[in-house]
């Protein structure tokens, strides 16, 4: 079947699933496709394809749409995509992407980890999917800690979460190893306080080598940014160094804070979603804010387009173009092959 034989409904469905960066190239495919881009109805349909979750690992991006019906792993640099079939439509799930290297073949493979609280709300349920197979498996994991969902990052293939102990509620950090499909040992933060003692806490990656954490206790505007030693596959113990202390009440109180830190320039770039009240309309809305703060505590706000996904917290990460080839489904061997 040729493109000209496809129905308009099917064409519109295809275009709604194409990454935005590729849409411009498709306009020159034929007159019909170009006319679809001009059609306001189709353009509005494209805008309705919202992204609810994004996660970054090794130059690959994992996208989940607003109703958990579309899951895509994308390498923007290589222009490759891999569509993965979600196992259920449930917006309470969280998804992360990680990698591991096979000891014998030295080949790097990728897995998607999905988790959510069970109906009783006291236990996390985990499922994992090999990217090459799209086959989901249930993991038997028992933990004595809870995940701080708003703060998880990927480094060297592992996923790191801020966590809090179920008994004393102290904030710590744990990582998930995709080779063993298990959580590692507890990694203490620079200082220990119960989760409720923190006004703001956020996790970040520094130059794909280190982890960084922003900490602010309740009742104070003082914020500290700490950075770990370099992390590799053999790192067993983390040591923390404080690189920046800020004392400014103009930022850091909003949920979903995401940040970068420049160790040399002693400067931090922050993204956060803030609740704003418009006097003229009496409407309360969420707006994304982007700003830099340095040792002088001066806040410089930057221009930033508002997101089409009001429910999604700002998520910022350092992206380095990757030559990683996305694994595609392996063909089942036929008899006689």
Curated annotation (Swiss-Prot):
Which SUPFAM superfamilies does UniProt cross-reference here?
F-box domain, Galactose oxidase, central domain
Looking at the record, the residues that make up the F-box domain are: 1-46
A Pfam short name:
FBA_1
Q: Which NCBIfam families match?
A: F_box_assoc_1
Name the chain's protein: Putative F-box protein At4g09870
Q: What species is given as this protein's source? A: Arabidopsis thaliana (Mouse-ear cress)
């Amino acid at each position: 079947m040729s493109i000209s034989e496809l129905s308009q409904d099917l064409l519109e469905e295809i275009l709604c699933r194409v990454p935005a960066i590729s849409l411009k190239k498709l306009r020159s495919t034929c007159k019909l496709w170009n006319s679809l881009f001009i059609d306001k109805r189709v353009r509005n349909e494209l805008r309705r394809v919202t992204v609810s979750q994004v996660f970054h690992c090794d130059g690959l991006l994992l996208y989940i749409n607003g109703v958990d019906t579309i899951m895509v792993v994308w390498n923007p640099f290589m222009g490759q995509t891999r569509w993965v079939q979600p196992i259920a439509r449930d917006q309470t799930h969280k998804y992360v992407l990680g990698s591991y290297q096979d000891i014998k073949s030295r080949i790097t493979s990728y897995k998607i980890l999905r988790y959510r609280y069970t109906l009783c709300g006291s236990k996390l349920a985990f499922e994992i999917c090999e990217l090459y197979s799209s086959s989901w498996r249930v993991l038997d994991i028992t933990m004595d800690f809870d995940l701080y969902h708003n703060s998880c990052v990927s480094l060297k293939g592992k996923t790191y979460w801020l966590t809090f102990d179920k008994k004393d509620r102290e904030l710590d950090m744990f990582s998930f190893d995709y080779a063993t499909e298990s959580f590692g040992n507890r990694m203490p933060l620079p200082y220990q306080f119960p989760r409720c003692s923190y006004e703001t806490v956020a996790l970040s990656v520094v130059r794909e080598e280190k982890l960084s954490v922003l900490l602010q206790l309740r009742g104070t505007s003082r914020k500290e940014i700490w950075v770990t030693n370099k992390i590799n596959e053999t790192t067993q113990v983390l040591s923390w160094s404080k690189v920046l202390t800020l004392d400014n009440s103009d930022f850091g109180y909003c949920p979903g804070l995401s940040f970068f830190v420049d160790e040399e320039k002693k400067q931090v770039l922050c993204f956060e979603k803030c609740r704003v009240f418009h006097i003229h309309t009496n409407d309360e809305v969420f707006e994304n804010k982007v700003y830099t703060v340095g040792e002088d505590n001066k806040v410089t706000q930057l221009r930033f387009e508002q997101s089409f996904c009001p429910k999604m917290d700002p998520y910022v990460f350092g992206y380095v173009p990757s030559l990683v080839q996305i694994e595609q489904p392996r063909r089942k061997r036929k008899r006689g092959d």
